[in-house]
């Protein structure tokens, strides 16, 4: 009976990623590796990369949703850096978070100072009183 290998026993379960266990799209394993290699601390807990991946995924989804709205407002189907810039700068909290960030090819927000706008003239039809 030699040479038959193992008989029976439990079949190994299909590998399940930590991202799928947490219900995330962002890679928990890669975030964990980067936290370990980045010399942020001597040890990294099991929950830290899951939490960080979830935060990064949430922020990305938020920015992409606002950028998609900006693209749709401009009648475009492709998000370009200008749409990202408009999305971030028009949102108060994202603008505060990414205030020191420069987006290449993002342009600036359209803004004209009120004093530079032409004066409002009164209507030409004044009632003539006696």
Swiss-Prot record:
The modification N6-(beta-hydroxybutyryl)lysine is found at residue 37. It comes from the Eukaryota. Its main location: nucleus. One of its GO terms (cellular component) is nucleosome. The modification N5-methylglutamine is found at residue 105. Pfam families: Histone, Histone_H2A_C. Deiminated on Arg-4 in granulocytes upon calcium entry. The modification Phosphoserine is found at residue 2. The modification N6-crotonyllysine is found at residues 37, 119-120, 126. The modification N6-glutaryllysine is found at residues 96, 119-120, 126. SUPFAM superfamilies: Histone-fold. One of its GO terms (biological process) is heterochromatin formation. It is found in: Nucleus; Chromosome. Keywords: Acetylation, Chromosome, Citrullination, DNA-binding, Hydroxylation, Isopeptide bond, Methylation, Nucleosome core, Nucleus, Phosphoprotein, Ubl conjugation. Residues 1-22 are annotated as: Disordered. The modification Citrulline is found at residue 4. GO terms for molecular function: DNA binding; protein heterodimerization activity; structural constituent of chromatin. The modification N6-lactoyllysine is found at residue 10. Residues 7-19 have a biased composition (Basic residues). The modification N6-(2-hydroxyisobutyryl)lysine is found at residues 6, 10, 37, 75-76, 96, 119. InterPro entries: Histone-fold, Histone_H2A, Histone_H2A/H2B/H3, Histone_H2A_C, Histone_H2A_CS. The modification Phosphothreonine is found at residue 121. The nucleosome is a histone octamer containing two molecules each of H2A, H2B, H3 and H4 assembled in one H3-H4 heterotetramer and two H2A-H2B heterodimers. The octamer wraps approximately 147 bp of DNA. Core component of nucleosome. Nucleosomes wrap and compact DNA into chromatin, limiting DNA accessibility to the cellular machineries which require DNA as a template. Histones thereby play a central role in transcription regulation, DNA repair, DNA replication and chromosomal stability. DNA accessibility is regulated via a complex set of post-translational modifications of histones, also called histone code, and nucleosome remodeling. Belongs to the histone H2A family. This is Histone H2A type 1-F.
